[in-house]
Amino acid sequence: MFSRDLTIAKYDADLFAAMEQEALRQEEHIELIASENYTSPAVMEAQGSVLTNKYAEGYPGKRYYGGCEYVDVVEQLAIDRAKELFGADYANVQPHAGSQANSAVYLALLQGGDTILGMSLAHGGHLTHGASVSSSGKLYNAVQYGIDGNGMIDYDEVERLAVEHKPKMIVAGFSAYSQILDFPRFRAIADKVGAYLFVDMAHVAGLVAAGVYPNPVPFADVVTTTTHKTLRGPRGGLILARANADIEKKLNSAVFPGSQGGPLEHVIAAKAICFKEALQPEFKTYQQQVVKNAKAMAGVFIERGFDVVSGGTENHLFLLSLIKQDISGKDADAALGRAFITVNKNSVPNDPRSPFVTSGLRFGTPAVTTRGFKETECKELAGWICDILADLNNEAVIDAVREKVKAICAKLPVYGA
């Protein structure tokens, strides 16, 4: 029998110490990685619940194990809320991650060697959209589109490539693109060549849920997302679609048993909470502020003479090119880290440096907005970053910024009393 008094602190001091240090880091550091956010205590509570004990292969009402009557309720709540949130007819909440959701879509609708047309990783796409190092680029014939000289997706190029290569599937989505995707145009191109349209909205799902970014569900054959990032839930995946019995059956089979075994019902419970939170009016206010904050930060960088890819942002993120300053993303990332500002180095279009070094930084505002930053704080923060980038090896500047960061983080904590 287990005692509820046997906490991590009492049982494993080494692990507890690392967890406490991470909690302190999250409170004292400013988080600007576009794919990161902070979950609510309720989301974390669900992930640490007794639901982790239950194995439940199959789907609600059709399980391969007994004793699933209550996890069926949990999973159905998550399904129903996801469908309501995104206006979908179908939702599969079982994918363990966004990448696994994407892999399941390919498995469901493609055969090995089929052609897919996705956004180049070097131009802001994602590994799972056909990058050569990913299974999506190894199992399928991946053709890549990119952005033009103004940093915008070249839809004429997308159409030309689609007509030339006749892909079975066109993938719309990104990991580092700051503009609005033209879903009707993607749909028209897909229809022209008889391709499936698959949208990966992992980065903007929260914005979509709040109505501040176009919803791809009415246009796509299949939509996937992660449940963290802007959606502010647990780390996990989600597949959505309009009503289509054939596609729904293929998707369900591709997730289980095609690519996963038992679902993580404790994470699915956390997804259900996340979807409920996203259905509240205050979530829309939050997402509107996320975009305002990103625009405010990008504006400061432009004023200070830095190159923002695409010339600005219409969502939660933007890419800063440091080619003109001859600064590597790796060095800039490290310097900002010493100031307690967490970002990630990122390749930029026509980057002369390797993907491990890069000439750019990616910024995102979901996490700072969660802790209460508004335009004033974000402009101030962008100014501090510019000060560091202007003199990367000036430790006095870095030290001064670090003290300012610690002060504003103390004023605007992630988790209050």
From Swiss-Prot:
<dbReference type="Pfam" id="PF00464">
    <property type="entry name" value="SHMT"/>
</dbReference>
<keyword id="KW-0808">Transferase</keyword>
<keyword id="KW-0963">Cytoplasm</keyword>
<feature type="binding site">
    <location>
        <begin position="125"/>
        <end position="127"/>
    </location>
    <ligand>
        <name>(6S)-5,6,7,8-tetrahydrofolate</name>
    </ligand>
</feature>
<feature type="site" description="Plays an important role in substrate specificity">
    <location>
        <position position="228"/>
    </location>
</feature>
<dbReference type="InterPro" id="IPR049943">
    <property type="entry name" value="Ser_HO-MeTrfase-like"/>
</dbReference>
<protein>
    <recommendedName>
        <fullName>Serine hydroxymethyltransferase 2</fullName>
        <ecNumber>2.1.2.1</ecNumber>
    </recommendedName>
</protein>
<dbReference type="InterPro" id="IPR015424">
    <property type="entry name" value="PyrdxlP-dep_Trfase"/>
</dbReference>
<dbReference type="GO" id="GO:0005829">
    <property type="term" value="C:cytosol"/>
</dbReference>
<keyword id="KW-0663">Pyridoxal phosphate</keyword>
<comment type="pathway">
    <text>Amino-acid biosynthesis; glycine biosynthesis; glycine from L-serine: step 1/1.</text>
</comment>
<dbReference type="InterPro" id="IPR019798">
    <property type="entry name" value="Ser_HO-MeTrfase_PLP_BS"/>
</dbReference>
<comment type="subunit">
    <text>Homodimer.</text>
</comment>
<comment type="pathway">
    <text>One-carbon metabolism; tetrahydrofolate interconversion.</text>
</comment>
<feature type="modified residue" description="N6-(pyridoxal phosphate)lysine">
    <location>
        <position position="229"/>
    </location>
</feature>
<dbReference type="InterPro" id="IPR039429">
    <property type="entry name" value="SHMT-like_dom"/>
</dbReference>
<feature type="binding site">
    <location>
        <position position="121"/>
    </location>
    <ligand>
        <name>(6S)-5,6,7,8-tetrahydrofolate</name>
    </ligand>
</feature>
<dbReference type="GO" id="GO:0035999">
    <property type="term" value="P:tetrahydrofolate interconversion"/>
</dbReference>
<keyword id="KW-0554">One-carbon metabolism</keyword>
<dbReference type="GO" id="GO:0030170">
    <property type="term" value="F:pyridoxal phosphate binding"/>
</dbReference>
<feature type="binding site">
    <location>
        <begin position="354"/>
        <end position="356"/>
    </location>
    <ligand>
        <name>(6S)-5,6,7,8-tetrahydrofolate</name>
    </ligand>
</feature>
<dbReference type="InterPro" id="IPR001085">
    <property type="entry name" value="Ser_HO-MeTrfase"/>
</dbReference>
<dbReference type="GO" id="GO:0004372">
    <property type="term" value="F:glycine hydroxymethyltransferase activity"/>
</dbReference>
<dbReference type="InterPro" id="IPR015421">
    <property type="entry name" value="PyrdxlP-dep_Trfase_major"/>
</dbReference>
<keyword id="KW-0028">Amino-acid biosynthesis</keyword>
<comment type="function">
    <text>Catalyzes the reversible interconversion of serine and glycine with tetrahydrofolate (THF) serving as the one-carbon carrier. This reaction serves as the major source of one-carbon groups required for the biosynthesis of purines, thymidylate, methionine, and other important biomolecules. Also exhibits THF-independent aldolase activity toward beta-hydroxyamino acids, producing glycine and aldehydes, via a retro-aldol mechanism.</text>
</comment>
<dbReference type="GO" id="GO:0019264">
    <property type="term" value="P:glycine biosynthetic process from serine"/>
</dbReference>
<comment type="similarity">
    <text>Belongs to the SHMT family.</text>
</comment>
<dbReference type="InterPro" id="IPR015422">
    <property type="entry name" value="PyrdxlP-dep_Trfase_small"/>
</dbReference>
